[in-house]
Amino acid sequence: MIDINNTLDLIKLKFYNEWLYTAHIYDEGTSPMHETLTKQVIDQYVLPLNIPKNGKVLDLGCGPGYFLNYMREQGYTDLTGVTLSPEDVKMCEANGHTIKKYDMSFLPQQDGYYDESVDFIFLRHSLEHSPYPIFTLMEYNRVLKQGSKMY
């Protein structure tokens, strides 16, 4: 929560916005190795969590959509990727995925990200790209349902 009456919060917000709109957006590109590793992670760590097949699942910093592709193959239906990379957006949308084009640190309520509304968050190799990871994690804690997991 940013307090607009607090000068320090405004300075942080200004810094963050400048960083966000001038920083290079990490574009992973396509990689058979990353695709294979993503499938292994899903098989070993995600599927055993028994996430409901119709549960709301987010892939934050989704890259070219390997997680989204494989989860759809496993029968999951409510999948959303979040990225700022135009190349990744194109690849994911070409595969029929729902993609949100905004900063993964802020999940807007107008898009349905209410308190305790998400069943699972996947953010492999994404959190390190947040300038304020503690705020990002607080946001994920806000939207995750009680007892839900994040990888």
Predicted regions mapped to residue ranges:
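A short glycine-rich, Lys/Arg-flanked "PGG" loop and its adjoining helix->strand segment in the class I
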Residues: 134-149
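Short conserved AdoMet
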Residues: 52, 131, 145
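Conserved N-terminal segment of class I S-adenosyl-L-methionine
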Residues: 1-116, 120, 124, 137
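A short His-aromatic
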Residues: 125-129
